[in-house]
Amino acid sequence: MIDFINEDKGSGKPARYVRLSDQSPMDRVKDLLKDHWHFFKPTKPQLAILIIGGGTSFHMEGKYRELFKSGLNIAARSTKAMIVTTGQNMGAVKLVGDAVSEAQYLVPDGPSHLRRALKLLGIANWGLTKNIEDLINIKPNVLNRSHYYSNMEKRTGDVFPINGDHTNFLFVDDGHRNKWEQSYNNFVSRFISMLRDKDPHVMKCLFYNICDSTNLKCFREWIYLWSLFYLKED
């Protein structure tokens, strides 16, 4: 578990996480989501929204920022969507976290617990994550409880802090440090394929690649129309 501290704002709820190899079988990842993290309870999400890109050079203000957030919130709440990002606390991913935080609500989880209804999953590159030493479990047989400062900003040439509005993280370790490798992208591609397969426990998948703020100007209309299409198809 990750307890995010020193936040300007945030859910105040810890995030579950696991560190795994870039070669991990997708059936194991699916079991983790379904059986351990209960991503499909109380009902299976109708849609998975994958928002990738816009990490380092993204900036948006004013009405376009609000259009993006409202479009994402409409899709997330109407379809109980699972949202997937790269988990960074910057750029478009931070904006996604802000949007989900505003739309987030609690649902019962057993007789005496509540949990967050909207699932925001970060698939983060372990070798490019800031302060990974705080996330290493030194007692393998004991549930790790890490404290993470999510207000950190990325400096030039630095690694990436993670966003505290995410509910879960998959940290993909390909053995490399401080650089992007194709192995991470391959893991994300396999994850997308897993979501798109015909298994009844896997929802429909909607992929959006953000290159700059121009792409996001049409996001609200785009996500809304696609949500209607998927719902009608059911």
Predicted regions span which residues?
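Acidic/glycine-enriched connector segments
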Residues: M1-E233
